[in-house]
Every structure is written in C-alpha cells, then in structure tokens.
From Swiss-Prot:
GO terms for cellular component: cytosol. Zn(2+) 1 binds at residues 78, 139, 196. It is found in: Cytoplasm. This is Peptidase T. Belongs to the peptidase M20B family. Binds 2 Zn(2+) ions per subunit. The active site is at residues 80, 173. Keywords: Aminopeptidase, Cytoplasm, Hydrolase, Metal-binding, Metalloprotease, Protease, Zinc. InterPro entries: ArgE/DapE_CS, Bact_exopeptidase_dim_dom, Peptidase_M20, Peptidase_M20_dimer, Peptidase_M20B. Disulfide bonds: none annotated. Cleaves the N-terminal amino acid of tripeptides. HAMAP family: Aminopeptidase_M20. It comes from Shewanella woodyi (strain ATCC 51908 / MS32).
C-alpha cells in the first residue's frame, strides 16, 4: 500500500483547493469541485459503488458489504486546504531515512529540531516537507489518500469480511462549512470517523465549543482640520477596547483544556471599525460565561462613552462533540483497539479547534477524529511522515475488521 498511498498523496497536493471564506456558495472555490471530479473518476475506476458527487461538492461512495449483520460505518475527509497560507504550486521535498538534523526548506527557511522537537520521533523514516513557500496540504489530502488506499485494499480483497463502508469527501471544512450540506440520512452510516488529525496515534473526541463575536464601533468622521470636539475615531475606540482584553487569555497564552478569546480580524476607518473575536472553550458553562462577559464589556464601554457606540453580535459555530460521543462508547473503543493493533499507543487528546465530525456528531452521526500523520498544518513548516500515513491506512482497515468481529461474535 505504501507506494499507492505516496503516489496518491503527491498527486493530490499538486491541486490547489484552498477554500474562500468570502464566497458564500458551496463549494467556495471551483478547484474543490474540480478535485472532486478527479476523485470521482478514480473511485469509479477502483471499483467503488454508489459513487455520487452533489452539485454542492460532496463526494460519497461505498465499499459493498461482504457479510450481513454488521453496521454500516463511514470515513470522512475534506477536499479543501486552509486559506491561511499559500496553497498553490506546492513543491514537496521527500527526505528518506531522516537523520535527525535540521531540514532546509528550499533556499530560505528551516525546519529545525529545536523549534519542532517532534521531528526526532521520525529518525530513520521518510518525511515529506514543503519547500518553504507554501503549505503542504496534508490537511486533508493525507486523509483522502489514506481512506482511498485502505478501502481500495478491501475492494481488491473481497475475502476480508466487513459490513458496508461509506466514504465522504466534504468541501469547505477549513472555513467551518464542511457539515453544512452533509446528508446524514443519505450517507447511511451508523457512525463515522474523520481522518483529519495530526501526529501518529491521535484520537480525538473532544473539541472546543466555538462562537464568533463581531464588535462594531460607530464613530463620527469629519475633516481632520475641523475635528476638535467633533471627530470620534471608531478605530481608536476599537483599539482601546482590545487593549483592555486579558493578555494571557489568547491562543498563544493557552494550551490543553484552556479556552481563549482570539482577535482574528480588525478593520475599519474613522467612521466605523470592526473587531472579530473567536470565542473558544471546552467547558460549555465557561463558554457561555465568556460570551456573557464579552457582551457585558461592550455594555460597560458604551456606558462611559459620550459620543459613539459599540455593538456586538455573537454567533455560535459548533459545540463540543464529547456530549454526543459519550452515549456511544463503542465508537471510541473500536478506534482505540484499532490504533493499538497497529503497534501504536493511542494519543487521546482534545482538539483545540473543530472538525466536520463535531457538527456531524450533533446531527446524529457520532464522529471522532483520527490521525493522518501530519504536523504543523496550515503553514510552511508543515510536514508528514510516510510511515505514519501507512499506519493511518492500517487503522482504517482495522476499524472495518474490528467492527465486523464485534458484531458477528455477539
């Protein structure tokens, strides 16, 4: 499977499929649909059944069951890559038998073991890195390659017992819309796994509760030469508001189960300005407290103003999937056993973000997240270990087999 997996991955990352948050249609970029068409043709050639591509960019397919009495399960990955950094003209570097030293990325950057000590876990293995000018696209082209390679193996070996296996490749996960048009009843799986995690062994079934707060400052513009006592600069209002936000309650000041406020965008002019904050926390009660606290800060700020005002609008994005996974412990237990079967210790950790699986779990499709083998997603220091990708494909196969064993032996 190694060569097929590597060939697929290197072919997929050459296709720029960055999503575009400014575009409200689905998919948000034409390239995602073009990539889905390519994958559809590949799945048909490999012998997958019920291969369907919706006009909204959702590609689904099936591996038919070889035995009866086993639940239908699914595997999910996303077509888009992050818009955070350049995703076009990707030129990967393949480092075989990695020696544990710093890796030069092209001519101008470095993947250093001091900054990224996880590199030392892969001495003697094969790494794929960027050339320092783009992201790599392992999030989530690696997941797509691993799912197709693993399930193609099942098609090639019909003697392996398993129930029906479904796959779905979704658009626009990176901009929070991946589950927006997901047809859960049509998908037909009792549970599923996103193959969208990071380092070897990761298994995630907790994620942030997430909301976005948009704070709009309303000022008063006039000619600066006659501004005395008249002008109210909305940008100054916004800057002063942010200056009093807690300094350590940020992404760079938090870890593990800490939540945060993240100023992700600020823009404006004298008349109007806008601050956009991401609100994140694992604990639903603290999450709600954060939203109330930010609203109260805006109200308090307004109370001290003579002219001008702030307005706040908060929109929930997704919630912690743990609440929906706990009632279905077998979904996690099978994944843990599958990871262990590949000689890996499961690395159970919370997702300091979200996945399609978080929203799908609230749509009656329990959906934990499993590793792809990649590190440092969304930037030029992204890299992935080929051996870890092989292990991910092995975990997918093991999940299919273990599900079959557990239900046939009841």
């Amino acid at each position: 499977m190694r060569q097929a997996l590597l060939t697929r991955f290197l072919r997929y990352i050459k296709i720029d499929t960055q999503s575009k948050a400014s575009n409200t249609r689905s998919p948000s970029s034409d390239s995602q649909l073009e990539f889905a068409v390519i994958l559809k043709q590949e799945l048909e050639q490999l012998g997958f059944e019920r291969v369907e591509l919706s006009h909204l960019g959702y590609l689904t397919a099936s591996v038919p069951k070889t035995v009866d009495g086993v639940p239908c399960i699914g595997f999910i990955a996303h077509l888009d890559t992050a818009p955070d950094f350049c995703g076009a003209n990707i030129t990967p570097q393949i480092i075989e038998n990695y020696d544990g030293e710093d890796i030069l990325l092209g001519d101008s950057d470095l993947l250093s073991t001091e900054q990224f000590p996880s590199l030392l876990n892969y001495v003697g293995q094969t790494l794929i890195t960027t050339d320092g000018t783009t992201l790599l696209g392992g999030d989530d082209k690696a997941g797509i390659a691993e799912i197709i390679t693993a399930l193609a193996h099942l098609i090639e070996h019909p003697e392996i017992p398993h129930g029906e296996i479904r796959l779905c490749f979704t658009p626009d996960e990176e901009i929070g819309r991946g589950a927006g048009h997901f047809d859960v009843p049509g998908f037909g799986a009792q549970w599923a796994y996103t193959i969208d995690g990071g380092e070897l062994g990761e298994l995630e079934y907790e994620n942030f509760n997430a909301a976005t707060a948009v704070i709009r400052a309303k000022g008063n513009n006039c000619h600066p030469g006659t501004a005395y006592g008249v002008m109210v600069n909305a940008q100054t209002m916004a800057a002063r508001f942010h200056a009093k936000m807690p300094l350590q309650d940020t992404p760079e000041g938090s870890k593990d189960y800490d939540g945060f406020f993240h100023l992700v965008n600020m823009q404006g002019q004298t008349e109007e300005a806008e601050l956009t904050y991401l609100i994140r926390d694992f604990d639903i009660d603290i999450f709600e407290q954060r939203k109330r606290w930010l609203t109260e800060r805006v109200n308090s700020y307004n109370a001290d103003l003579v002219v001008g005002s702030l307005e706040i609008e908060i929109t929930d994005s997704y919630f912690n999937m743990k609440e929906q996974i706990i009632p279905h412990p077998h979904v996690v237990d099978i994944a843990k056993e599958a990871i262990t079967s590949q000689g890996i210790t499961p690395l159970v950790k919370p997702i300091r973000g979200g996945t399609d699986g978080a929203r799908l779990s609230y749509m009656a499709l329990p959906c934990p997240n499993i590793f792809t083998g990649g590190h440092n997603f969304h930037g030029k220091h992204e890299y992935i270990c080929v051996e870890s990708m092989e292990k991910a494909a092995g975990v997918i196969l093991a999940i299919c087999s273990l599900t079959c064993e557990k239900y046939l032996n009841r």
